[in-house]
Amino acid sequence: MTHELFDSKGLLGSAPAAFVAGEYELDSSHGTLPVINPANGQLVAEVPSSSSSTVDRAVTAAVAAQREWGRRSHVARAAVLEAVRDAIAVHADELARIVSVEQGKPLSDARGETEGACAFFDFAISQKYRAVGSMMASEPGRSLGVREEPIGVVAAILPWNFPVAIFARKVAPALMAGNAVVLKPSELTPLSALALARLCRLAGVPDGLLSVVCGEGKDTGRALVTHPGVGMVTMTGSTRGGREILAQVADQIIPVSLELGGKAPFIVFEDADLDAAVEAAADARLWNTGQVCTCNEVTYVHADLHDEFVRRVVDRFASVTPLDPFAAGSRLGPLVAERERTRVQGMVDAAVAAGARVRTGGGRPDGEQYQSGAWFAPTVLTNVRPEMDIARREVFGPVLPIIPFDAEAEVVSAANSTAYGLTAYVYTRDLSRAMRMIDALEFGEVYVNQAGPEQVQGFHTGWKSSGLGGDDGPHGYEKYLRRKTVYVRHAV
């Protein structure tokens, strides 16, 4: 039976299909990808997996389309992106339904994600009057200039946690900079990208300039990032996946931008606003069911506040009821897939075996409605030690380990001991201490007395094993450009 998401008049059409060089690819001879609703475990669709020959057609078409697109003025490119942004706003409800079905987040959060996608397009559009470059006299009768140019074809690899927002985060600046994009969404959430590709075409994005190929990373992804026509790879995903991409493209020597995993410490000092810290710690852990690279992954609380903080956070977590993404008042959905639920359960079980104490949650919620689907109850763990696996590896689920500390130097050392370096949080009323922590923490983003999300004009970048390059703002936009130095002798 065809899922209700598929309609000849809708963004997905009557059947799921890759979007390649302006055409819809229905060929399933290379296999299919099952799309499962994580709330109930039911099959939503089977999406054709793209072969290496399909990837080749997409990149070849992108090379041709980029030549014309790159010659357009910034203002002309921005006009197309404005049409895409407006189309996303018009179709926000349909896009949100697709996200909720395939990814599992509450419908209200999915609607917020579409708003975030529009914001990414807004920032890219703002670059239409960008005036960056230089021309200067170098010697009498000679000048020297440095200017920006598009890279060419960008291969974009997307994760499953924000399939609409991160599509926009990659596509908008890449196109605005004059590039073409061939994009591979996660095999768990391909429908959002396919819907957006159709929407982009309707909004006037030229055929071939944007293609979406579907498949697993080891097949379709590898064929894409190693294609000789690709000039840059941008990827958001796991650290393991980032390492694989770096190895795959090493022979090509092309720019790579990676936004990878994180193990964000959330540090609460004795002088913190306790109400604000508790609320932010919970929100930063439970947003998107904990499936955010910037989520609060381990909370360090000063010993003077520890017991009261734990009591309040446990009450807060226990009050959150996981609900079907389409249910009224839903604020916490399932994990994205059963494999993720199993992985998170294994980490919690290992922590308990090592001495951690479950204060609330700990596994699948009670109730018949939770027996199908990838459900996991909001979980708080205490008696956690910094050397435990759950305090060092990314959980990516609604699990909050809490660790007490006594001294500033102690917590800095513990926070920095992870291999990751994406996001950190600090709660204190002491400005001098806050500035010391900003200096000491080895993370690309530091939030002081607030939680996320990040803003489009900032720079979302990780240190250490959390990535290379980054997204957003002028620094992220520049990743999609290369520079050419021009020497001119004009005196004869």
UniProtKB/Swiss-Prot annotation:
Name recorded for this polypeptide: 3,6-anhydro-alpha-L-galactose dehydrogenase
The record's function comment reads: Involved in the degradation of 3,6-anhydro-L-galactose, which is the major monomeric sugar of red macroalgae. Catalyzes the oxidation of 3,6-anhydro-L-galactose (AHG) to form 3,6-anhydrogalactonate (AHGA). Shows broad substrate specificity, with maximum activity toward AHG. The enzyme activities toward D-fructose, D-galactose and D-ribose are between 40% and 50% of the maximum, but those toward L-rhamnose, L-glyceraldehyde, D-glyceraldehyde, L-fucose and D-glucose are much lower.
Residue ranges annotated as transmembrane are none
> How does pH influence this protein's activity?
Optimum pH is 6.0.
Active site, renumbered: 259 (proton acceptor), 293 (nucleophile)
> EC?
1.2.1.92
A Pfam family matched in the record = Aldedh
- What biotechnological or industrial uses does this protein have? The AHG metabolic pathway may provide a useful platform for the efficient production of industrial chemicals and biofuels from red macroalgal biomass.
